Swiss-Prot record:
It is found in: Membrane. The chain crosses the membrane at residues 590-610. Residues 41-589 are extracellular. The lineage of its organism: Eukaryota, Metazoa, Chordata, Craniata, Vertebrata. Its main location: membrane. GO terms for cellular component: membrane. The keyword Transmembrane applies. Residues 1-40 form the signal peptide. This is Uncharacterized protein KIAA2013. Glycans are attached at residue 363. InterPro entries: K2013-like. Residues 611-634 are cytoplasmic.
Length: 634
C-alpha cells in the first residue's frame, strides 16, 4: 500500500520544475561516470565494447592488419617517395619499352624510338582471388624511389574447399609482413615492376604470410595459370628443370594498318596457391616480351614464320637466363638501377602561389617520364665502347636548356593525369620540348638525359660553351625549391633557392665530387665580385640575389676562372640592384585609375556636403543664422 501511494504521487512530483532539473542533472552525472569508467577500463586493458563491424564479420581485423602493414609508408609519404593510388594517379610501371597499367591489367609495347606504342590483346599480370574470404582491406602505392607498384591486401579467410596443395610454403623471409599482421588475418603483398636494366622483362612478386591456424588458399587467374588469350597461341617449353609458357600472336592493326608480331615467354604458375598455417610463401612470376617491327598485312604470311621464330628464340634464351638467376637478385638489381637513375631531382620546399606545381606533382611527373624513357646506358649487354660514348654525350655541355623556365608550364607539370595514354602523350611532349630547346644530346641518351633536361628546365638553368648559368625570372623567386644532381663535368651540383628570416631570396650551391676533383667557380649576377671556388663542404656556399639592368643570369658556374673574371667586362650593364629594390620598381603601387577614382569620390562627397549646407542656410526658405531677442519664437 505504501509503494502504491508513492507511485500515485510520482506524477505530481515530476510536475515540479526543480524536480525535473534535479533528474536531468543526475542523468548527466551518470553519463559522465559511465564514459569515464569505460575510458579507464580501456586504458587498463579491461572489458570494453567491440568496434563496429559495418555488417562484415571480422571487418575490424583486416583494417588493423592493414594499418600495421602500411605504417612504414607514413614517413615515405611525407617525403614524397610514396604516392597512394587514386584518381589522378595512374597505376603505371614501365621501363621505356614496356608499359603496364596494373589497375586495368593492360600492356603496351613501344617497338621503336619514334613509333607509337601498341597494345597487344594480352593480360599481363596474374590476379589472385582468395577462396572463402570473409573480409578484406587493401591499399596500393607507387614507390617512386624503387620504381615499382606495391599492393597490400589483408584477408580474413574461411575454410578453403577441398583441393590439392599446388604450392607449398617456403622458408623465404617476407620482410615487414609478419610484424603486427594480426593472428586471424592473412597478409598478401604484391610487387609489380618493369625491370629497369632488362627492357624486355617485367615481373610480379607474390608474398603471402599466413600466421593463422588454417590453410590459406588463393585462386590464380591469368595467362600463366589458364588458357591462352584469343589472339595468341601457347606452347609449354621444357628445358632441363625449367618450364615456361611461350605465347605467340600479333597486335591489333595500327591506324596506318600495320601489325606487329608479339612473343611472350612466361613462367608457369599453378592454378591454386595454398600456404600451410604459420608459414610464408614467396613466389616471383617472370615475363619476357619481344615484338617485331611494323609489318604490312599483305606480306605477313610470307614473313610471319621467320619473324616469329627469331622472336621466340630471343624470348626463350632470355627466359632461361632469368630462371637461372635468384629472383631476389633480379629485384635488387632493378631497385639499385632505379635508385641510381632517380638520384637527380627537384625538391619543392615552400610554395606561395597557386600556379606553381606541388612537390607531389613534380615527383609524379619525374617518375612517369623516367618510366616511359628507355635507358640503354643501364643495359648489361652494352659494350664498353658504347657506354663510354653515351657517358661522353651525357656529360657534353650542350646548350640545354634554352628559353624560359618550365616551372609554371601546366601542360608539362600537370596536376592530374587520368590514364596511361595521357602519360604516353606527356612523354612525347617532353621529348619534343627538350629537343627544341637544345637538349637533343640528352634526349638521345635516354632516361638519364631526359631527367637532366627536366631538372635544368624547371629552374631555368642553361649550359653554354664555357659555363652553366642560372637564368630564372627574378619575379618568381618567392618560391623555395632545390635542384639536385645537376651533372657538370664529372661532378654533381646542387642549387637551391631559399628565403632568409626577412623573406629575401638567396641562392645556396653545393658540389658532390665524383671521381677526380675539378675546381669549380661561381659568381653572382654581373660577376663584379671575385668568383668563389665551390667545394664539397656540407655547408655549401650562399649568394645573394642581384638583378641587373638589362636582365642577365643570376648566377654563373664554370671551371674556367679566367672566363668568369672576363665576363664582367662583356655584360655592359646599366645597373645592379638588390632583389627587393628590383621588386619595388616592378611594383610601384596601386594603378593611377584607382587613385583617380578615390579622389573623384572624395571630391563628389564634399560637393554634396557643400550643397546640403548651402540649401540649409542660403537657399529659399532658409533660416537666419542669428535670431534677435525680439523674436517671439525665442
Amino acid at each position: 500500500m505504501w509503494l502504491q501511494q508513492r507511485l500515485k504521487g510520482l506524477p505530481g512530483l515530476l510536475s515540479s520544475s526543480w524536480a525535473r532539473r534535479l533528474l536531468c542533472l543526475l542523468g548527466l552525472l551518470l553519463l559522465l561516470l559511465w564514459f569515464g569508467g569505460s575510458g579507464a577500463r580501456r586504458a587498463a586493458g579491461g572489458l570494453h565494447l567491440l568496434p563496429w563491424s559495418r555488417g562484415e564479420p571480422g571487418a575490424a581485423e583486416p583494417s588493423a592488419c592493414l594499418e600495421a602493414a602500411t605504417r612504414a609508408w607514413r614517413g615515405l609519404r611525407e617525403r614524397g617517395e610514396v604516392v597512394p593510388l587514386g584518381p589522378g594517379v595512374p597505376a603505371l610501371v614501365a621501363n621505356g619499352f614496356l608499359a603496364l597499367d596494373v589497375a586495368a591489367n593492360r600492356l603496351w609495347v613501344t617497338p621503336g624510338e619514334r613509333e607509337p606504342a601498341v597494345a597487344p590483346d594480352f593480360v599481363p599480370f596474374v590476379q589472385l582471388r582468395p577462396l572463402s574470404a570473409l573480409a578484406e582491406a587493401g591499399e596500393a602505392v607507387l614507390l617512386l624511389r624503387e620504381g615499382l607498384l606495391r599492393r597490400v591486401r589483408c584477408l580474413q579467410l574461411g575454410s578453403p574447399g577441398p583441393g590439392p596443395v599446388a604450392a607449398g610454403p617456403g622458408p623465404a623471409s617476407v620482410s615487414g609482413l609478419a610484424a603486427g599482421s594480426g593472428r586471424d588475418c592473412v597478409l598478401l603483398q604484391e610487387d609489380f615492376l618493369a625491370h629497369r636494366g632488362r627492357p624486355h622483362v617485367y615481373l610480379q612478386r607474390i608474398q603471402l604470410n599466413n600466421p593463422t591456424e588454417r590453410v590459406a588458399a588463393l585462386q590464380t587467374v591469368g595467362p600463366t595459370a589458364g588458357p591462352a588469350p584469343k589472339a595468341f597461341t601457347s606452347t609449354l617449353e621444357k628445358v632441363g628443370d625449367h618450364q615456361f609458357l611461350l605465347y605467340s600472336g600479333r597486335s591489333p592493326p595500327t591506324p596506318t594498318g600495320l601489325v606487329h608480331l608479339v612473343v611472350v615467354a612466361a613462367k608457369k604458375l599453378v592454378n591454386r596457391l595454398q600456404v600451410a598455417p604459420k608459414t610464408q610463401l614467396d613466389e616471383t612470376v617472370l615475363w619476357v616480351v619481344h615484338v617485331s617491327g611494323p609489318i604490312n598485312p599483305q606480306v605477313l604470311k610470307s614473313k610471319a614464320a621467320k619473324e616469329l621464330k627469331a622472336l621466340q628464340d630471343l624470348a626463350r634464351k632470355e627466359m632461361l637466363e632469368l630462371l637461372d638467376m635468384p629472383a631476389a637478385e633480379l629485384l635488387q638489381d632493378h631497385q639499385l638501377l632505379w635508385a641510381q637513375l632517380f638520384s637527380p631531382g627537384v625538391e619543392m620546399k615552400k610554395i606561395t602561389d597557386t600556379h606553381t606545381p606541388s612537390g607531389l606533382t613534380v615527383n609524379l611527373t619525374l617518375y612517369y617520364m623516367l618510366s616511359c624513357s628507355p635507358a640503354p646506358l643501364l643495359s648489361p649487354s652494352l659494350s664498353h665502347r658504347e657506354r663510354d660514348q653515351m657517358e661522353s654525350t651525357l656529360n657534353y655541355e650542350d646548350h640545354c636548356f634554352s628559353g624560359h623556365a618550365t616551372m609554371h608550364a601546366e601542360n608539362l607539370w600537370p596536376g592530374r593525369l587520368s590514364s596511361v595514354q595521357q602519360i604516353l602523350q606527356l612523354s612525347d611532349l617532353w621529348r619534343l620540348t627538350l629537343q627544341k630547346r637544345g637538349c637533343k644530346g640528352l634526349v638521345k641518351v635516354g632516361a638519364p638525359g631526359i631527367l637532366q633536361g627536366m631538372v635544368l628546365s624547371f629552374g631555368g638553368l642553361q649550359f653554354t660553351e664555357n659555363h652553366l648559368q642560372f637564368q630564372a625570372d627574378p619575379d618568381v623567386l618567392h618560391n623555395s625549391y632545390a635542384l639536385h644532381g645537376i651533372r657538370y663535368k664529372n661532378d654533381h651540383i646542387n642549387l637551391a633557392v631559399l628565403a632568409d628570416a626577412e623573406g629575401k631570396p638567396y641562392l645556396h650551391v653545393s658540389v658532390e665530387s665524383r671521381g677526380q676533383p675539378v675546381k669549380i667557380y661561381a659568381c653572382k649576377a654581373g660577376c663584379l665580385d671575385e668568383p668563389v671556388e665551390l667545394t664539397s663542404a656540407p655547408t655549401g656556399h650562399t649568394f645573394s640575389v642581384m638583378v641587373t639592368q638589362p636582365i642577365t643570369p643570376l648566377l654563373y658556374i664554370s671551371t674556367d676562372l679566367t672566363h668568369l673574371q672576363d665576363l664582367r667586362h662583356t655584360l655592359h650593364l646599366k645597373a645592379i640592384l638588390a632583389h627587393d629594390e628590383h621588386m619595388a620598381q616592378q611594383d610601384p603601387g596601386l594603378p593611377f585609375l584607382f587613385w583617380f577614382s578615390v579622389a573623384s569620390l572624395i571630391t563628389l562627397f564634399h560637393l554634396f556636403l557643400f550643397k546640403l549646407i548651402y540649401n540649409e542656410y542660403c537657399g529659399p526658405g532658409a533660416k537666419p543664422l542669428f535670431r534677435s531677442k525680439e523674436d517671439p519664437s525665442v
